[in-house]
């Protein structure tokens, strides 16, 4: 009887097994892929669901942006409406480093194609595991417009 009580007490206080580093990295990459899909269907709220609300820090163009809501408002204002305004977003070359059981850093590249305009850049993102979900707490972007290839002169 005492052994049964001790066994039940041990089960009741047992911590869930820690996820493997590979599964944590996969969960982070899944968060980014979910965000990418949301952007590509024009769902900016869905895109922003990957960021910690309200205290995420955004850095872009050498400036701090106005938090979660300010960034959502910016995306809706500058990229909302017609699909050609939001374009197609693709994240690639992503590398995840686990810093602690609840913290990770991702560095990767992205490409945003909006009609003839193509913007590429690098993202550095700090993730924190909050209530079992990986969320971005700091996002730094450096971007540049890709120059279109020169057109060949017409032959006389």
List each language-model region with its residue ranges.
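A short, structured loop/turn motif at beta-sheet edges
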Residues: 96-103, 127-133
């Amino acid at each position: 009887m005492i052994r049964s009580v001790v066994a039940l007490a041990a089960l009741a206080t047992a911590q869930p097994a820690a996820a493997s580093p590979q599964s944590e990295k996969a969960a982070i990459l899944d968060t980014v892929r979910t965000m990418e899909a949301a952007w590509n269907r024009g769902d900016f709220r869905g895109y922003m669901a990957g960021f910690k609300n309200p205290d995420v820090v955004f850095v872009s163009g050498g400036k701090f942006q106005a938090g979660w809501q300010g960034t959502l408002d910016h995306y809706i204002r500058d990229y909302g409406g017609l699909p050609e305004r939001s374009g197609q977003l693709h994240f690639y070359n992503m590398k995840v480093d686990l810093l602690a059981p609840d913290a990770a850093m991702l560095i990767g590249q992205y490409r945003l194609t909006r009609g003839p305009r193509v913007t590429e850049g690098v993202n550095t993102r700090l993730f924190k595991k909050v209530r079992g979900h990986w969320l971005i707490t700091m996002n730094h972007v450096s971007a540049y417009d890709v120059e279109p290839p020169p057109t060949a002169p017409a032959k006389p």
